[in-house]
């Protein structure tokens, strides 16, 4: 990478490399030096962008949120006017992608989430970035007629996180369910949730 790389592009490269290292090596494998070496950057480049470990972790969390927000293309996002089928299709597709083509991001997210339990300053940052997704989901379930949006969002997030953790890091890690299986499970959950 050139010494003259724009700061935003270098920041993305550092954050993407940090996420890849978290997925591959875990929290212990994430160091400023490892990011420099893996990204092919001159030594000290990562430190120039993120002086402290906390700053590097925050950079990774911010990039994770940006990349996860783009898991679905605009035309794939659930449309409340499309009813329950639209919600099921969109959420199932996002969950399936987290298990398959975005598996590395999912692993990195779990590494960061666990680290956030030991670092209050990271917890606050991690929770704030996650609030964007929760707010969007709250809007969707409210539009579907949820009588208790906060509880329903918690149930949906718990279902998705449980499935993703089990299939990425848990005892079901050898094979991710197919999109049809994810969709069927989600449909069962939402049918019960909305009394259909």
Identify the role of each PLM range.
Residues 13, 17-24, 71, 108, ...:
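Solvent-exposed, amphipathic alpha-helical segments
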Residues 16, 22-23, 41-45, 75, ...:
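Anionic, Ser/Thr-rich low-complexity intrinsically disordered regions
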Residues 70-106, 153-156, 179:
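Hydrophobic alpha-helical connector segments
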Residues 52, 115-120:
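Short loop-to-helix capping motifs
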Residues 3, 123, 127, 142-196:
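Hydrophobic/aromatic-rich alpha-helical bundle segments in the mid-to-C-terminal region
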Residues 13, 17-59:
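Helix-turn-helix
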């Amino acid at each position: 990478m050139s010494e003259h790389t724009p700061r935003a592009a270098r920041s993305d490269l550092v954050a993407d490399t940090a996420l890849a290292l978290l997925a591959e090596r875990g929290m212990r494998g994430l160091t400023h030096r490892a990011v420099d070496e893996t990204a092919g950057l001159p030594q000290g480049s990562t430190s120039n962008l993120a002086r402290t470990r906390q700053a590097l972790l925050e950079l990774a969390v911010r990039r994770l949120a940006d990349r996860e927000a783009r898991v679905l293309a605009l035309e794939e996002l659930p449309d409340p006017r499309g009813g329950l089928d639209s919600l099921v299709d969109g959420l199932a597709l996002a969950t399936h992608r987290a298990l398959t083509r975005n598996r590395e991001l999912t692993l990195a997210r779990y590494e960061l989430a666990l680290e956030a339990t030991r670092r209050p300053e990271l917890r606050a940052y991690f929770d704030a970035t996650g609030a964007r997704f929760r707010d969007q989901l709250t809007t969707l379930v409210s539009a579907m007629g949820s009588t208790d949006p906060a509880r329903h969002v918690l149930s949906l997030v718990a279902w998705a996180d449980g499935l993703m953790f089990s299939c990425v890091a848990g005892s079901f890690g050898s094979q991710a369910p197919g999109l049809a299986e994810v969709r069927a499970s989600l449909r069962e959950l939402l049918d019960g949730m909305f009394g259909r």
